[in-house]
């Protein structure tokens, strides 16, 4: 029952998928991050359904790309994009660490957030349009699962930049050892299946995900002294985009 409640809390927190409502407690949040990747699985399945509709019902290319880019936003309600934009404002302020952390708390949107989100959207849509091979698209769909596995691992492994906020609360209440092990197991199983589906596409995506994870650790440590809830959303976005670019590039080559 506790695991079911943790799953519901995870989907309630990180998606717009309707879930039963109840009062959360610390026990419910202990294993919440274990189920975080499955929101990515839902996104991947919806994208595959959309690809099937595109292939069989005469959907135009531009409609296919636009709706395909919109599906992750619709499922999550833009939760991670909000973190991406706040983080872009903070990183591009070039101010001292304390002021960057203050910018992350600011509810106002800055010019750099808009500019970088526009650039991100164009890059993601361009890469998405290049992923035409069926096996490449299966790997791409699984990337949303992988990005969330890595994001959850970062939450329970990396240093927090501050001692308050949602990320600190979730990391503090999580059973770190069990959550970390569960996420690593899910990540390893997913990658193993993808390597069977298509070795070149899987290797390209795994490299992109690993580089994104490394960059995230180095960048947040340098700029903020650790991670926050906003940077967790930022990581999900950059990891998804990096994997899409890698798959789009390999699709173009082979």
Question: What is each residue range found by the language model?
Answer:
Residues 82, 93, 101-102:
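Glycine/small-residue-rich loop that forms an oxyanion/phosphate-binding "nest" at active or ligand-binding sites
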Residues 1-77, 91, 95-96, 106, ...:
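Hydrophobic alpha-helical transmembrane segments
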